[in-house]
């Protein structure tokens, strides 16, 4: 069994960096997760910090921010709220559950409201 695993690693079939890159790409583009949630899930799979960081570097910053804004706009149309503060709280909880950073969330919510 060890020989088989060693052979797979040598032939680049088992590659942590490639896995991290594919995982990041899929979760970001398909599920529209943020960096925090992606990092947490990769850590649960015991992927090294180096591989995680290399995978996360592949996310285009402009596309990342566009995803954040698109998610907020879509959710904003779908939720019902008693007042402005309730709406903002629901939007913030939703987008943070997707794994986006607090600072980016605050900036995006400010832009959405103003």
Predicted feature descriptions by range:
Residues 1-114:
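An alpha-helical, amphipathic repeat domain used for nucleic-acid recognition
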């Amino acid at each position: 069994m060890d020989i088989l695993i060693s052979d797979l690693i040598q032939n680049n079939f088992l590659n942590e960096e490639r896995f991290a890159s594919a995982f990041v790409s899929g979760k970001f583009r398909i599920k529209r997760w943020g960096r925090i949630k992606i990092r947490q899930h990769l850590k649960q799979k015991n992927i090294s910090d180096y591989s995680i960081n290399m995978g996360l570097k592949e996310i285009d910053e402009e596309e990342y921010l566009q995803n954040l804004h698109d998610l907020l706009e879509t959710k904003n149309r779908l939720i019902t709220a008693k007042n402005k503060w309730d709406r903002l709280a629901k939007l913030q909880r939703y987008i943070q559950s997707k794994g986006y950073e607090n600072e980016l969330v605050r900036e995006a919510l400010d832009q959405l409201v103003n």
